[in-house]
Amino acid sequence: MTTWTAPLAPQPVHATVTVPGSKSQTNRALVLAALAAAQGRGTPTLSGALRSRDTDLMIGALRTLGLRVDGTGPELTVSGHIAPGPHARVDCGLAGTVLRFVPPLAALADAVVEFDGDEQARARPIAPLLDALRGLGVRIEGTALPFRVHGSGALAGGTVAIDASASSQFVSGLLLCAASFTEGLTVQHTGAALPSAPHIAMTVAMLRQAGVDVDDSVPNRWQVRPGPVAARHWEVEPDLTNAVPFLAAAVVSGGTVRITGWPADSVQPADNILSVLGKLNAVVSQTDSSLEVRGSGSYDGFDVDLRAVGELTPSVAALAALATPGSVSRLSGIAHLRGHETDRLAALSAEINRLGGDCTETPDGLVITATPLRPGVWHAYADHRMAMAGAIVGLRVAGVRVDDIGATSKTLPDFPRLWARMLDASLPDGEEHGM
């Protein structure tokens, strides 16, 4: 682990930032490219793909399944067939997309594929997806990592009911492979309110872009017809969730940050992100190719339902902790975060309170009363979003040390350098922040 002193922003931050490609879109595109190649449709390609631990784990998983992925940077080519060798083992690391998108793909192999990952990943929810695959006739050993998928070379498909209240990725994982099932697939969500619905919308949009027929006209029900998956070129958008900490720097410092490449029409939950920023006295300006946020440096507490965009919670909690002293913020709709890379609600409460803050867990979220914070160690829990949240707090509080900034390699390996470059752009000539 690499301890990192979060740099202070003693003056307004004014910078232009370019963030790499979307993790969510990259890993979905890789799965769809693998399916197209396996169907013999051609050679799909990706440009702007994110290269990080999560996406490299997905590339490794596809190679384990017998596919070929060429390219060392953001330009990738996928070819080959689903034909794992003996003793095939997929390393999921801590990547939820690998854990939940690849088992349905492995079910199409005529082989046994073992799945395992980081110790923390063994606590991440997966049983509902495995049960759904069993309901479709797949033989699976285990109910959590490590587990084995006994593929038979084909899958009939049909109809499956699943409780995806713990993770929308259960639904996405099934939908991504459904067109390759003999009968297609109908997925019915049967549980409580579905979290991260925009990520299922992203999956549906990308399936349609690949020529797959998807009917999502009935709430909580998705029907995918069997058929070809196009071997197309995927242009990956910048990761808008990873852009949020940089936009937060404008909010807390009273500066202006512009994100380049912000799409005018996105498959990511852009509208949800803009809605959150609108609660923080921020002025948001958007063009066809960028987004600019001008912060006031001061804002009151706020109420926000983050069910659709739970990934934003650590950054939003950090912003709540830095609001006008005495103001109260309520973050709701995020009970499912207890099953993310770490229990994010417990982790955020512990770290904010460790620095002298006032954060209380509720059944489905957090209540944060802004109080002056003190220097100290901010623990990342091997969680990229937690590490970035510590960086946001450090903009306003001198002496905050993130105990594992390397956790950001999960989705943004260049985070420390990008963060320092953003702050350096606001300093007088000749001065710079350390990385």
Curated annotation (Swiss-Prot):
Pathway membership, UniProt: Metabolic intermediate biosynthesis; chorismate biosynthesis; chorismate from D-erythrose 4-phosphate and phosphoenolpyruvate: step 6/7
One cellular component term from this protein's GO annotations in UniProt: cytoplasm
Enzymatic reactions: 3-phosphoshikimate + phosphoenolpyruvate = 5-O-(1-carboxyvinyl)-3-phosphoshikimate + phosphate
Active site: residue positions: E311 (proton acceptor)
Molecular function in Gene Ontology: 3-phosphoshikimate 1-carboxyvinyltransferase activity
Gene Ontology annotations of biological process type: amino acid biosynthetic process; aromatic amino acid family biosynthetic process; chorismate biosynthetic process
Compartment(s): Cytoplasm
Alphabetized Pfam families for the sequence: EPSP_synthase
Residues that coordinate or bind 3-phosphoshikimate: K23, S24, R28, S167, S168, Q169, S196, E311, H340
Alphabetically ordered keywords of this record: Amino-acid biosynthesis, Aromatic amino acid biosynthesis, Cytoplasm, Transferase
EC code(s) of this entry: 2.5.1.19
Binding site for phosphoenolpyruvate: K23, G96, R124, Q169, R344, R385, K410
NCBIfam families, A to Z: aroA
Biological function: Catalyzes the transfer of the enolpyruvyl moiety of phosphoenolpyruvate (PEP) to the 5-hydroxyl of shikimate-3-phosphate (S3P) to produce enolpyruvyl shikimate-3-phosphate and inorganic phosphate.
Subunit structure, interactors included: Monomer.
Family to which this protein belongs: Belongs to the EPSP synthase family.
Protein name according to UniProt: 3-phosphoshikimate 1-carboxyvinyltransferase
Species in which this protein is naturally found: Mycolicibacterium paratuberculosis (strain ATCC BAA-968 / K-10) (Mycobacterium paratuberculosis)
Lineage of source species: Bacteria, Bacillati, Actinomycetota, Actinomycetes, Mycobacteriales
